[in-house]
Amino acid sequence: MIDSKKLIEELKERGLMSSLSGDLYEVFSKPTTFYVGTDPTGDSLHVGHLLAFTTAKLLQKYGHRPIVLVGGFTAKIGDPSFRDTSRPLITDEQVLHNSECIKAQVSKLIDFNSDTENKAIMLNNDEWMGKMNLSDYMKNVAKLTTVNYMMAKESVKKRLNREGEGISLCEFLYMTAQGYDFLHLYKEYGCRCEIGGQDQYGNCTIGLEFIRKALGKSDACALTWPLVTRADGTKFGKSSNGKNIWLSAEKTSPFEFYQFWVNQSDEDSEAFIKKFTLIPLDEIEQMIAKHRENPSARYLQKELAKYMTCLVHSEEEYNKAIEATDILFGKGTTEQLATIDESSLLAAMDGVAKVEVSRDMFTSGTSVIDLANMHDKVPSKSEARKLIKSNGFSINKEKVTNEKDVVDASKLIQGKYLLLQKGRKDYTLVIAK
């Protein structure tokens, strides 16, 4: 037997429970198979997807078996849930490629490889939905629901009520495909629970309806978690300049990923370390208490960023991110700056001014006065001279003390970058092409 009461209390304390249908206490009182869906329309997940797999990992820790269901078939339809417009459709080849990429990422979050009975499996709903013809659909799926039931769903009503929009029949039928997924997994894999975000609650419950009508069973359940927002009401999952934070190192560097977490507010860090990590709750309370003693040290943010970066990338990438942070924003030296990889440098400089110049100007050398004048906050050469005389200007972390100095190509980081620094925090990145 599994202590389902303890599990559900932990879900609540971590903020991982929003809506519930069915008897969750009974379903999770013994080892149970559950499923979580993922969308293969892209080749990488982003941080907005992490909560699904945090929840799945927690359930797996208690002895339950996860099915990660790739929506290969439904991706070719488009989910209308709380979207203002339809999704673009994708090809079978794209679905296959994206599914492989997603599995590689998810494998870091939940266990697919152990010898335990509850190791995760990954399935693609195209395996059963893709084989179904119209006659099969009418007999096996369409008869299990009514138009009235579907019209009452909030996601459908929102699209229908938007002037000039409407909803295609293809998208309208999406929820029946998701409902049939639950029915199929219930019959073939003994799956008794679907988990998802709050915006998926309507689609989750139609699966329960299908199981009840097709099999006369009412022992399945659905569990959803609240949508994640920041304390200030802004959307979670994007950087300060509005970019998605991806799990793929090619799309978002580990340095930028680390910075995303370490820059969270105190209030958000307290919530996110409960939601996104499996650090025991009593330890988290101790960490929060320690953080509150000296919030300016950002202890909690650093611990959250460490956990998430090690989880999604690796301890090695975490150490590189820490080193890059110390070099760029701490007391790094010119020699240390030269060791930073290009992706970390560009990620760190993402929000600063950039100046593109010809590499030829460094062949015979460029004066430090001219370089200082390239800085975003140095409007003239006279200001550049004053800045240098006051020891307020650095190139590649090295103070410039002689206004007659010149800089040649040997000083370029990675053969093409110069980091201009005014004071302690004002940077401009020179890119030589």
Q: Language-model segments: which ranges?
A:
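NTP-dependent nucleotidyl-transfer catalytic core
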Residues: 1-200, 205-208, 215-221
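Conserved nucleotide- and phosphate/pyrophosphate-binding catalytic cores
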Residues: 210-433
